[in-house]
Amino acid sequence: MTSGPHNLEDPIVRAIRQKNQAPSHDFTIFVQEDGSSVSTLDRVVKNVQAPATYIPTDVEFFDINEPDKPDLHFLRNHFIREGRLSEEQTLYIIKKATEILKSEDNLIEVDAPVTVCGDIHGQYYDLMKLFEVGGNPANTQYLFLGDYVDRGYFSIECLLYLWALKIWYPKTLWLLRGNHECAHLTDYFTFKLECTHKYNIKVYEACLQSFNALPLAAIMNKQFLCVHGGLSPELHTLNDIRMINRFCEPPTHGLMCDLLWSDPLEDFGSEKSNKHFIHNNVRGCSYFYSYQAVCTFLENNNLLSVIRAHEAQDVGYRMYRKTKTTGFPSLMTIFSAPNYLDVYNNKAAVLKYENNVMNIRQFNCSPHPYWLPNFMDVFTWSLPFVGEKVSEMLISMLNICSKEELYETDLKESAPTQHKQPAPSENENKADQEIDIEARRQIIKNKIMAIGRISRVFSVLREERESVSELKNVSGTQRLPAGTLMLGAEGIKNAINSFDDARKLDIQNERLPPSNSRRRSTDLKAFEEVMNSSEDDTSIDHLVERFADKKSSL
């Protein structure tokens, strides 16, 4: 009797053939830890619009009624959704606005009523809030005091929208130059990287040309000198500003530098020294100016006050000591970037001047999309974390390596070869053995030290990834408090308890950046220190000596 084909079938094949059908599962539904279900086809936070991933056509870009001007309403909403323009559209806005800026004087004259605004620093979503508080640019005159770019991650959107407004309202929207509107700072901070990430180097270079065209100061209502930084020992009359050749990269000293970089003294109004100007050691360039220096300048030029930006303020503004002759504040600082760098927790403000009445309007920060540091993608950002853990695993594996495992390795290495060699003498054998032991000991040392260096490099890279706010520790150790880095950005925010803490932490980033050659030298030195730091690591040293001695003695 012959067996049928089913009787000869392998039990495993039969089990596969007769397996129960898998239960149906809807992969478009994801069950969260709390038991709630969400669709994988929908946005989890539905009230946040999806990013605009398309480049607009020229029909969308240009206004219907004014075909040579960009559509402001479209631009505003497109940038809110993180949309980008074509290279041609971007350059059109920059170049057309630059032509208007070039035609303006170094010292422009602005009548009242006007709304004066301080630093913006790439906080586009807060800029939209500013216009809600300050008024529609279509029927409100604005004077911006500079620093539109850097530090924030939406600088190019701020620039393009403000430049588009300048095209529409060339006689009612005024833009002054800040210290960040230059090649040196935008290369050092984030703006150049942002331009090349979102657009290309051609757009960045067009922005630099536009920065050189920005006016340096303004006389508002024939009463107020408005400028980004402040006064200078070389500034005696308003004609001194008019005589500057502004169409260049700002120098590191002189009148143009001081207009962009100078600050009032910390004890402004209660100075113990009679000096009008002293070196600004906080900025690394320019000067601190005194109350008496401001009063003297105002009297000599028949002005009421100086209005400037340049310094973050806890409540968005600061009024300084009043002059003896007019009883009006000699100096005012206005800052319009709320919760600066997402860690300062400060309010922002704009100054509205109308009918000889000055009002301060404050506002808080608005939600905005999150960017990883330096516009990194999540895979690049996570590599140092993975690398650090892998190197830690290698060191841990060395720590649990047993003497028997080392002995087995020795037996394999010392296994006899097929070719017979003449037997060496006893002295030669002993000398060769000592040389071989020392050589193997050095090889082991080098391998473990290499792992230590790799571990240290990944550790430093990981700390840089987590230090998203570019802040340095106030204690001067260049490291955040113990445990803070393990909590990432939230840990950094929690470690900063006040506005003053944030300013102290960020003080190094307020200085004039070093030159490119000095930066390269500093980076090289820092890399060498990182590579050498493993040699000073006692745990690595102990591991090296223990295993080198153990293995060489077997």
From Swiss-Prot:
Q: Where does Fe cation bind?
A: 119, 121, 147
Indicate which residues the UniProt annotation says bind Zn(2+): 147, 179, 228, 310
Keyword Transport appears in the UniProt entry: no
Please indicate which superkingdom the organism of origin belongs to.
Eukaryota
Which stretches does the entry tag as region Disordered? Answer: 411-433
Q: Which reaction does it catalyse?
A: O-phospho-L-seryl-[protein] + H2O = L-seryl-[protein] + phosphate; O-phospho-L-threonyl-[protein] + H2O = L-threonyl-[protein] + phosphate
Q: Where is the composition biased (Polar residues)?
A: 415-426
The UniProt keywords, alphabetically, are: Calmodulin-binding, Cell shape, Hydrolase, Iron, Manganese, Metal-binding, Protein phosphatase, Zinc
Q: Which cofactor does it need?
A: Fe(3+); Zn(2+)
The Gene Ontology terms for molecular function here are: calcium-dependent protein serine/threonine phosphatase activity; calmodulin binding; calmodulin-dependent protein phosphatase activity; metal ion binding; phosphoprotein phosphatase activity
What does the entry's cofactor note say about binding and number? Answer: Binds 1 Fe(3+) ion per subunit. Binds 1 zinc ion per subunit.
The alphabetized list of GO BP terms reads: calcineurin-mediated signaling; cellular response to calcium ion; fungal-type cell wall organization; intracellular calcium ion homeostasis; negative regulation of calcium ion import across plasma membrane; positive regulation of mitotic actomyosin contractile ring contraction; positive regulation of mitotic division septum assembly; regulation of cell morphogenesis
According to the record's subunit comment, the protein's assembly and interactions are: Composed of two components (A and B), the A component is the catalytic subunit and the B component confers calcium sensitivity.
Q: What does this protein do?
A: Calcium-dependent, calmodulin-stimulated protein phosphatase. This subunit may have a role in the calmodulin activation of calcineurin. Appears to be involved in cytokinesis, mating, transport, nuclear and spindle pole body positioning, and cell shape.
The similarity comment for this entry is: Belongs to the PPP phosphatase family. PP-2B subfamily.
Protein name per its UniProtKB record: Serine/threonine-protein phosphatase 2B catalytic subunit
Instruction: Look up and give the organism this protein is from.
Output: Schizosaccharomyces pombe (strain 972 / ATCC 24843) (Fission yeast)
Which gene does this sequence derive from? ppb1
